A protein has these predicted regions:
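Acidic donor-binding segment of Leloir-type glycosyltransferases
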Residues: 20-63
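Glycine-rich, basic loop-to-helix element that forms the pyrophosphate-binding segment
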Residues: 64-81
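Short aromatic/hydrophobic "clamp" motif used to bind/position activated sugar donors
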Residues: 86
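Conserved donor NDP-sugar-binding/catalytic core segment of glycosyltransferases
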Residues: 94, 98-129
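A recurrent flexible, glycine/aromatic-enriched loop bordering the glycosyltransferase active site
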Residues: 140-160, 176
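Acidic donor-binding loop at a coil-to-helix junction in glycosyltransferase catalytic cores
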Residues: 176-184
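Active-site donor/metal-binding and catalytic loop motifs
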Residues: 191-228
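Non-catalytic, C-terminal membrane-associated alpha-helical segments of glycosyltransferases
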Residues: 219-222, 236-290
Length: 290
């Protein structure tokens, strides 16, 4: 049996589930299921829309009133699932490959963890999230990802055996945004479980406003700071920050950020937003954390 698992928080999953249902039916799989788990969404319209998923054959919608956290909601989905293989897809992704499910079914022979990647569609040059994702697109081919299989892994689109997920669940200390997937990739390497990268992308085409992305980024940086010891070697920003600290330059950079941080943030929120300013802001924000 194949289980398709979608954690959601304030994301409308209806079109995503419809696309997956059509592919599952076309494959004539012996048994399959789609489970959508709402992690305490607050948008009433989205909740109402997602409740209609229960009317789609093969789909189940589970609503949690409280927010469990990004790691815990995925572990919850594993407990709800019945499949031998599990496909995780983020709720804000879009199916862009007509043979998406077929490719994953065929890839089951390759390994217990298979990551399909993602592509970027739409967006504008004034949107910071779009610029950020678009910049990294050239490095997202399966060939390049396989060079660093554990460091180029994300939970937005992957297949995993039930056995691996039961043996290595997501670390539920990661309640807030960021790095739960990075740490899980590290755990796979520690325990000698291979990650196979293939070209089977979903599309990332929904980009939050610059202000929301900055808030999310700051939350991720606080997560990185909290788990900095566990994530050493798995974050380029952490590597730079540690080097500055070893050279006793952290106080200087933190001081500069206190003076320039608000100005940088205003730039990032404007139509002149750019990635160089974003990288400087991220480093400065991280170094200013206690």
């Amino acid at each position: 049996m194949l289980s398709i698992l979608i954690p959601t928080y304030n994301d409308d999953c209806y079109e995503l589930v419809q696309a997956l249902t059509l592919q599952a039916k076309a494959l004539n799989l012996a048994d399959w299921e789609i489970i959508v788990a709402d992690d305490g969404s607050t948008d009433g319209q989205v909740i109402a829309r997602n409740k209609n998923l229960q009317d789609i054959p093969g789909c189940r919608f589970v609503r949690n009133n409280d927010n469990m956290g990004r790691a815990a909601i995925r572990n919850f989905l594993v407990e709800q699932a019945r499949g031998k293989y599990l496909i995780f897809i983020d709720a804000d992704m879009k199916i862009c490959e007509p043979n998406y499910l077929k490719r994953y079914v065929m890839a089951q022979a390759l390994g217990n963890v298979v990551y399909g990647g993602y592509i970027v569609q739409g967006g504008t040059k004034t949107n910071l999230r779009f610029l950020y994702e678009k910049q990294g697109e050239k490095n997202r081919s399966a060939q390049l990802r396989n060079n660093q299989p554990y460091k180029d892994f994300h939970t937005s689109n992957f297949m995993v055996s039930r056995k691996v997920m039961k043996d290595l669940p997501f670390d539920e200390r990661f309640r807030h945004y960021g790095y739960e997937d990075v740490f899980w990739g590290k755990q796979l390497e520690v325990y000698g479980e291979s990650i196979v990268h293939i070209d089977n992308p979903v599309a990332f085409c929904t980009f939050e406003q610059n202000s929301d992305f900055i808030v999310k980024t700051e939350e991720g940086l606080r997560t990185l700071r909290l788990f900095r010891n566990e994530l050493k070697g798995y974050s380029p920003l952490l590597k730079v920050a540690d080097k500055l600290e070893r050279n006793k330059l952290k106080p200087l950079f933190a001081c500069i950020f206190r003076v320039m941080g608000k100005r940088l943030k205003r730039l990032l929120l404007s139509k002149h937003t750019n990635l160089l300013a974003f990288q400087i802001y991220k480093l400065g924000y991280y170094l200013s954390l206690k």
